Amino acid sequence: MRESPAPSPTLPTQVDVLVVGGGPAGLSAATVLARSRRSVVVVDAGEPRNAAADGVHAFLGHDGLPPGELLARGRQELATYGGRVVAGTAVDAVAPEGADRVTVTCADGSRWSARHLVVTSGAVDALPDVPGLAEQWGRAVVHCPYCHGWEVRDQRVVVLATSPAAMHQAGLFSQLTDAVTVVVHDPQALSVDDRDRLQALGIEVVQGPVSRLVTSAGRLTGVEVPHGILDADAVVVASFVEATSPVLTAVGLEPADLEMTGRVVARSVPADAVGRTTVPRVWAAGNVTDPMAQVVMAAAAGTRTGAMVNAEMVMEDQARRLAG
């Protein structure tokens, strides 16, 4: 399904709910709202976090589906209930205290007025500056054993230790293959006790740093370390995950640090269990609030937030009618 053009006379700028971000969380939230007979529009910049991946995994009924196909199906389902997707980038928002609407401005100058705003703009993965790493990201370079682990089973896996998450990753991937090697790229990533523990578990620890990934005909074959080249079929690395949303920043919601053993490993926007933020009428769901959430978790979060937004509007409407 093709995305709708920017706002026109047939697409009113006033809607019940505006969703910023057309990934699994955003489309799920919008579909719940559309099925509740709410006018809902999704503004999508077209930059899904998992675009580089070959397929989506650990999502019941959708295993192996290319990310783009999953989103295309989601847009089609949303359209069935009258919801719309428009291409655009939301860059500003105003949510005045006590007001009954939130106003969002897009990069093309279009403006939307909504009773509630749901931000599901996801997060960005910042990778270590190692030549070849970004080019293989989502294919031979992975981070999640539940998203990509089965695909690298029994292969030679190198864990690039750049943060405390490497210890966790090494253990999880050792369940999938006996050929796990940890390369200490950042000396602060692992403690002496961590290294001793890995070696006691039979996981080889090699001193880095990694200077580059080695490929042949576009396929990963190894990583270069100070003493030579380690053969590798896959590299595991923990990206620094950061929620970025100018819309949330504009209304006063700044990302908060997430720490692991005293080191900041991600930043996300605080929200409660149903996606409610501290700013009235502004909600958030998916990776923007939970950087580690897989696709199915992000979709579930969007569904839950969409349901809560609808319930909130029902109560608002009832209160208005009772007030006469």
Language model features: what each stretch is:
Residues A29-T31, M167-Q169, A285-G324:
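A conserved FAD-binding loop/helix module that cradles the flavin
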Residues R139-Y146, R156-Q169, L190-V192:
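Active-site glycine-rich loop that binds ribose-phosphate moieties when present
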Residues M1-V17, V85-Q155, G222, A234, ...:
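FAD-binding core/adjacent interface of flavoenzyme oxidoreductases
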Residues G21, T120-G122, L127-D129, L160, ...:
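Short, well-ordered coil/turn residues at beta-beta hairpins
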Residues A72-C106, R111-A114, T177-S268, A311-G324:
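A Rossmann-like FAD-binding core segment of flavoenzymes
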Residues P9, V15-E69, Q155, A165-Q188:
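Beta1-alpha1 glycine-rich phosphate/pyrophosphate-binding loop at the start
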Residues E135-E151, V241-V296:
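FAD-site-proximal beta/loop scaffold in flavoenzymes
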Residues R35, S39, A45-E47, D54-T80, ...:
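N-terminal glycine-rich dinucleotide-binding loop that anchors FAD/FMN and/or NAD(P) in oxidoreductases
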